[in-house]
């Protein structure tokens, strides 16, 4: 005797219609044995479709007990019910319920994907099923390219993909012509003779006549359950048997297959609505482009500014007489001396030091007179300042010892006195009343901190002090901090040393490193402000993604129902839509980053002084942001999709 496969005891299913309850099933008691061919008949509204949904674990009874192969379904979770549908049931719908964007073989493969069957095995089985059902030449055809009978055979193949121990056929011939309907019925009869339990839900008496057992329903109750003694004789099959149930893969294989399916589905959904997808991505594209470009511009600007600061001596400390800039008493303080320079130079934290004295003097070359700042400095001055020579050389210690009448001029002085075509090296100019030979010209560097047209001339300190100005005290001292030494600590040490030597604090220091720190902080603050604006743009883009995904869930409700019917769990559906949201955002991110590089290239053509600097960190951050936006803003639509009721989803047009 066959075992009891499906058992219903006291099953009731009611629906709320407004303020009234509608009883679709009323105290149903039914047992269906393995291998039976059962027809459930009744007029429209009799409850036969609701009974099929309960039998197929697509719907839950309000009361009573339903067991599948001895397993009580009332205690199962939604995911466990999905596994039950996947492993035991195969659905054949009146309207086929094939996914229109997938080929026939891909529609058939779907249940095996959720079962974790390897790709090679499921493709082979799907192909054999379709060939067995006479569709060998239509494997890659989409539903729109198939006739009604062919689509129903694809639906049958899908129902058999995971074995189809129990076949639930809802009006399987209702949408077919007589020839196609007869072919489908012959297939179902063959399946039953091969050991499958087949349950036909129909109002067509001719279809029900093929069953060995007929159950009649009216107003949610079983009014008759009889053995069909008038069943027509079934001819012995002449065709080959259907391929056996495939061996299911492990969960890892299932996850890999699901991810592949999710990405394929996401891509198909995106390219099916190109304009909508582009508009959805627009906010993400603008946001990512803004973030990456702002960071690149900020980094480029910061490097440009810091480079200019370093050019004028970023690791230098200036010492001046008085208490601060603008001190009226500083002119009377004459305590800074050459011995202070020597004392500072001997300290381990000082790379080099130079004295400074200077005046504005009249400078003459032939019949050209100009006013220039003349400074007396040590030979190490140019090293301290990081100044390079464009022409010639700087003066050396021997020049200083001899009080040589040699000078180094800047580019502005060269242009004013000699013009761009005359070689100034070796030319004699009159500095005040002192004739001096030009031995070097400093490099012409464009600097945002020195845009003036001032003329500068440098000569050995000893020459300026002994031959030109007659001044023994210093106007200032410049020290260069040794590499690796903290500038702030060195500044404190310089203050302590000079205060100890002078016995009082009659000087002040100016550390250009503080300017660098200020520039860096300002740059970071500005970049943060602009990035926040860009983040707002990203958030707006994310909301757009969420809106369009909610629309997508609504449009694809029936697809979700089909996937649930063939065994998709809630987590599978949730993953499907999350992947789609992430893909939208990632593609938008890639386009945004690409646009940033285009902007950087155009920027380099328009602005020669400095360039946008793209960092790997900002690009990686952009990708991470894109992914997070997809996850965060795609979660609600994905959750909504996963929580859909299979019956309601299948009923949507």
Swiss-Prot record:
Residues forming coiled coils: none
SMART domains: AAA
Pfam families named in the record: ABC_tran (PF00005), FtsX (PF02687), MacB_PCD (PF12704)
Membrane-spanning intervals of the chain: 252-272, 278-298, 526-546, 583-603, 616-636
Key words of the record: ATP-binding, Cell inner membrane, Cell membrane, Membrane, Nucleotide-binding, Translocase, Transmembrane, Transmembrane helix, Transport
EC number: 7.6.2.-
Residues holding ATP: 42-49
Function in brief: Probably involved in the export of syringafactins.
Subunit structure: Probably part of a tripartite efflux system, which is composed of an inner membrane transporter, a periplasmic membrane fusion protein, and an outer membrane component.
Protein name, UniProt field: Probable syringafactin export ATP-binding/permease protein SyfD
Lineage of the species this protein comes from: Bacteria, Pseudomonadati, Pseudomonadota, Gammaproteobacteria, Pseudomonadales
């Amino acid at each position: 005797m066959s075992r009891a496969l499906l058992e219903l005891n006291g099953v009731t299913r009611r629906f709320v219609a407004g303020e009234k309850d509608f009883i679709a099933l009323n105290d149903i008691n039914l047992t269906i044995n393995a291998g039976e061919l059962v027809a459930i008949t009744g007029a429209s509204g009799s409850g036969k479709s609701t009974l099929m949904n309960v039998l197929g674990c697509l719907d839950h009874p309000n009361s009573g007990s339903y067991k599948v192969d001895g397993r009580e379904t009332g205690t199962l979770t939604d995911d466990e019910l999905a596994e039950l549908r996947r492993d035991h049931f195969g659905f054949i719908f009146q309207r086929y319920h094939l996914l229109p964007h997938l080929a026939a073989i891909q529609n058939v493969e779907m249940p095996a994907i959720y079962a974790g069957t390897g790709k090679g095995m499921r493709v082979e089985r799907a192909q054999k099923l379709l060939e067995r059902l006479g569709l060998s030449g239509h494997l890659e055809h989409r539903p729109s390219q198939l006739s009604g009978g062919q689509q129903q055979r694809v639906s049958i193949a899908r129902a058999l993909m995971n074995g189809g121990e129990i076949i639930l056929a809802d009006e399987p011939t209702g949408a077919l012509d007589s020839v196609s309907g007869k072919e489908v019925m012959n297939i179902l009869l063959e399946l039953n003779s091969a050991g499958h339990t087949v349950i036909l839900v129909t109002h067509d008496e001719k279809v029900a006549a093929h069953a060995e057992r007929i159950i009649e329903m009216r107003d949610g109750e079983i009014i008759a359950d009889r053995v069909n003694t008038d069943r027509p004789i079934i001819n012995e099959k002449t065709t080959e048997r259907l391929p056996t149930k495939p061996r299911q893969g492990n969960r890892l294989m299932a996850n890999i297959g699901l991810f592949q399916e999710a990405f394929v589905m996401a891509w198909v959904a995106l390219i099916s609505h190109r304009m909508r997808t582009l508009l959805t991505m627009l906010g993400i594209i603008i946001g990512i482009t803004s973030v990456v470009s702002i960071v690149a511009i900020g980094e480029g600007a910061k490097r440009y500014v810091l480079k200019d600061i370093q050019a004028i001596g970023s690791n230098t400390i200036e010492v001046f007489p008085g208490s601060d800039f603008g001190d009226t008493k500083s002119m009377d303080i004459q305590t800074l001396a050459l011995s202070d320079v020597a004392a500072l130079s001997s300290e381990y934290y000082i790379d080099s030091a130079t004295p400074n004295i200077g005046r504005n003097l009249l400078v003459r070359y032939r019949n050209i007179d100009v006013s220039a700042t003349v400074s007396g400095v040590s030979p190490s001055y140019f090293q301290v300042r990081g100044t390079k020579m464009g022409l010639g050389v700087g003066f050396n210690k021997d020049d200083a010892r001899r009080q040589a009448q040699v000078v180094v001029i800047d580019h502005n002085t060269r242009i004013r006195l000699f013009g761009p075509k005359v070689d100034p090296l070796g030319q004699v100019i009159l500095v005040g009343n002192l004739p001096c030979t030009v031995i070097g010209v400093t490099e012409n560097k464009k600097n945002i901190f020195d845009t003036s047209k001032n003329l500068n001339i440098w000569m050995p300190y000893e020459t300026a002090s002994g031959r030109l100005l007659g001044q023994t005290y210093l106007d200032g001292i410049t020290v260069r901090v040794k590499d690796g030494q903290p500038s702030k600590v060195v500044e404190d040490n310089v203050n302590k040393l000079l205060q100890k030597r002078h016995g009082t604090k009659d000087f002040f220091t100016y550390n250009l490193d503080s300017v660098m720190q200020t520039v860096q902080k300002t740059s970071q603050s500005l970049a943060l402000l602009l990035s926040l604006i860009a983040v707002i743009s990203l958030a707006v883009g994310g909301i757009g993604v969420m809106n369009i995904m909610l629309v997508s869930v609504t449009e694809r409700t029936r697809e979700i129902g089909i996937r649930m019917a063939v065994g998709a769990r809630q987590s599978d559906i949730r993953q499907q839509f999350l992947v789609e949201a992430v893909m939208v955002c990632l593609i938008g991110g890639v386009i945004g980053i690409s646009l940033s590089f285009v902007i950087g290239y155009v920027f380099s053509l328009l602005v020669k002084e400095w360039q946008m600097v793209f960092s790997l960190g900002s690009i990686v951050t952009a990708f991470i942001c894109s992914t997070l936006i997809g996850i965060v803003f795609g979660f609600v639509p994905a959750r909504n999709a996963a929580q859909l009721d299979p019956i309601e989803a299948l009923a949507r047009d």
